[in-house]
């Protein structure tokens, strides 16, 4: 990958402008004409983390993708909405070309004592990542940001293959280990909507809203090389150009790590 910017350098090389952070988004982190949604959320989280203590874990991100976040300087304005006994709410806005392109609310919560413990998740038994091949990249069709990722289909088929169902199980990884909340946020937005697999020819799709719930905070990879994570995703309802989908992310120890819910618009 020549002339590309790593995920960590892109976030850490931001500059301060008054009460805002300014990030420089490069072409290799785009999907279509806008920045990769996972990167947008990660930039918002980075700005919120300047205001929220690191010892309070991120629990939920609520993201609304409003308009294009263009290549070049992106200004992120963050503020704390409220700090309670256990939970802090913060907000971040991404400004691109003078317009708000993305609005993010972060919910950070300290652990509290509880007698309840519920886990109804079931790990999907699928072929191993090592037995599968990476999805090839097609310039002009696959989003540029996928240069920084790898995807291997264990269930379902890649986009535009005429699949019979909108349900996929995809092993995913970034090109650097998941070592922070920001990495985790970006990782959870890598996959395409499973609905695209049902189409027989390319068509654009775009996330409209995204809610990401982190189910644990002991997920950081400690190895020097990135590992594989499994994202099990399914469209539960789609009509009139709008899709509702849910995805569950599993780590290499088969532990559920994150729950992702999105409303996606598709132009087909």
What are these regions (language model features)?
Residues 1-268:
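Terminal targeting signals and extreme-terminal segments of soluble enzymes
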């Amino acid at each position: 990958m020549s002339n590309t910017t790593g995920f960590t350098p892109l976030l850490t090389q931001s500059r301060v402008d008054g009460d805002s952070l300014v990030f420089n988004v490069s072409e290799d982190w785009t999907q279509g004409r806008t920045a990769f949604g996972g990167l947008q959320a990660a930039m918002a989280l980075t700005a919120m983390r300047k205001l929220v203590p690191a010892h309070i874990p991120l629990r939920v991100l609520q993201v609304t993708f409003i308009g294009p976040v263009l290549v070049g300087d992106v200004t992120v304005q963050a503020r704390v909405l409220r700090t309670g006994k256990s939970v802090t709410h913060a907000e971040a806005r991404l400004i691109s070309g003078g317009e708000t392109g993305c609005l993010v609310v972060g919910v950070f919560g300290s652990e509290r004592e509880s007698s309840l413990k519920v886990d109804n998740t079931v790990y999907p038994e699928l072929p191993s990542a090592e037995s599968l091949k990476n999805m090839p990249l097609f310039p002009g069709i696959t989003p540029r940001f996928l240069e920084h990722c790898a995807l291997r289909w264990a269930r379902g088929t890649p986009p535009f293959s005429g699949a019979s169902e909108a349900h996929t199980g995809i092993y995913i990884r970034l090109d650097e280990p998941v070592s922070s909340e920001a990495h985790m946020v970006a990782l959870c937005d890598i996959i395409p909507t499973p609905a695209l697999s049902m189409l027989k020819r390319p068509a654009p799709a775009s996330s409209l809203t995204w809610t990401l719930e982190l189910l644990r905070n002991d997920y950081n990879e400690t190895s020097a090389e990135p590992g594989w994570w499994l994202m099990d995703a399914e469209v539960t309802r789609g009509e009139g150009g709008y899709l509702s989908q849910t995805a569950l992310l599993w780590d290499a120890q088969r532990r559920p790590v994150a729950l992702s819910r999105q409303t996606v618009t598709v132009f087909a």
